[in-house]
Every structure is written in C-alpha cells, then in structure tokens.
Amino acid sequence: MKQLYGVIGNPIGHSLSPVMHNDAFEHLNMDAHYLAFLVEEEALGEAVKGLKALGISGFNVTTPHKVAIMEYLDEIAPLARQIGAVNTVVHRDGKLIGYNTDGIGFVRALQSISEDPLQEKRILLIGAGGASRAIYFSLADVGVKEIDIANRTRDKAKNLISGCMENVNSHALSLECAAENQGEYDIIIQTTTIGMHPHVEYTPLEIRSLKQGTIVSDIIYNPFETKILGDAKEQGAIIQNGIDMFVYQGALAFEMWTGCVPNIDRMKQLVMRELGG
C-alpha cells in the first residue's frame, strides 16, 4: 500500500517540500507520496487527529504550527522539547512522535562546508528567534563549546542563553558589539529575516573585518546571495545560503521516516531549479 507523507502549515502553497520528497521517493523506487495540507490554526488539533486516523507515515510542520502542535503529539524527542518546537512528526507504533530537524539539518549543512570539526569553532549567531534557538541547541548538542548570540534586543538573546547547557560558553551581545568583534569568530550565522526579498539592501551586521577562512552562513535563500553574504564574499569568506539548511533538514526527515538516505546533491539541484537558480 502506498505510504502517505506530507506537510502542514498556513500558507502552504509555496512549499518546495512536496517536489523534493516526491522526487526522492521516485528516485529510490518507493511506493510513497508527499502532499501539502493547508491547516488553519484553530483546526490544528482536528487535523492532527485526522492525519493519525488516516495512517499517515510522517509529516513536516511549518509556520505557524511548530510550537502549537506539541500539545497534540504522543511523544516529543528531548532535543525538540529543549528547542520548544517540532517540524517533523514520525508515526511509529501507533504514536505520533515529534522531532526538530531544523537545527540538526543546519548543523549537517554547516559541517558539509567546514574543513575542521565544528566543535573547535567559535560561533556567532545573529538573531534570537525560533531559527536561532533551533540552531543554538543543535550546535550545543553536537559539542560546540563557544556560541555567542547577537540580537537587536539583547534581553532576548539573554533569555535564549539562560536555557543553555552548562558546558557551553555563551554571551549575549548587542549588534554593535558583535560588529566590533566580528574578527574573533570562525563562523557567523545569520538567522533573521533581514535581507530577505524584497528588502535585499539590508543587513543586520556590517561585514568589515573577518579573519581568514571565516564561514558566513545565512538561512535566507531568497535571494540566493543576501547583502551579508555578498559583503562576506568580498572579504574572502566561505559563504552558504539557506538552501543547504532546507535540503539537509528535509533529507533528515526523509531518513527518519523511511530509513533510507536520499541523494543530497540531487535534492539541492532540484530545489535550486525550482527557485530559478
């Protein structure tokens, strides 16, 4: 019988997940299909019940349901609970189990372009929202010891850090302080929406003086090269946009659902083609 997978959110028409996952199913000769489901906030509980009753094998969760869905699941993985959000649900042994592959997907994407182990790096996160939180706890989970957070409102960065693991050395910084000290970091990760289309002329951090070999990553993928990435490239940095994070988090969800590892390069090429790259 054909296995059913999907994604729930609102809006959902723009989602690239169906194209990416259905191509992977076809490429691996799997009898499965992935659909996008528009779910209103007030209907979330009923939608989750319905998906479970239909025997869905797994599904992704996107805006605005990543936090609210947690109360409707049977189990939540420890890292997802720490992050406080779920983006992937596995239907296993009659239970809906929530995971968060956003942060781990980003970590895998980052590892793919870093010559050295991430555990040896000093990292700066820009922003203190949901994406930053997922990345922060996932970096800590793989053993990164030095992670600072810069945010427009420093108190929000402090709140994020307050839940950190004891073995992580973290500081909450103003954006001005981060700009002054940017040369101290091996990796800078931009997690806000600043610089996203159509406001492409903006950047949360003016890149001025990076150390040699710095990696600058931006979770935005529209445009492919944001202002912060363009400025970093001019400084000789290694740059990475948000396509890698999107692909790696999707590939990890696919692996959790099916036990099969999809072709990352194929997924990335497909997504870039869909985005016009």
Curated annotation (Swiss-Prot):
The active site is at K66 (proton acceptor). InterPro entries: Aminoacid_DH-like_N_sf, NAD(P)-bd_dom_sf, SDH_C, Shikimate_DH, Shikimate_DH-bd_N, Shikimate_DH_fam, Shikm_DH/Glu-tRNA_Rdtase. Pathway: Metabolic intermediate biosynthesis; chorismate biosynthesis; chorismate from D-erythrose 4-phosphate and phosphoenolpyruvate: step 4/7. One of its GO terms (cellular component) is cytosol. Transmembrane segments: none annotated. Shikimate binds at S15, L16, S17, T62, N87, D102, Y221. One of its GO terms (biological process) is aromatic amino acid family biosynthetic process. NADP(+) binds at G127, A128, G129, G130, A131, N151, R152, T153, R154, D155, K156, I219, G242. NCBIfam families: aroE, PRK00258.3-3. This is Shikimate dehydrogenase (NADP(+)). It comes from Bacillus mycoides (strain KBAB4).
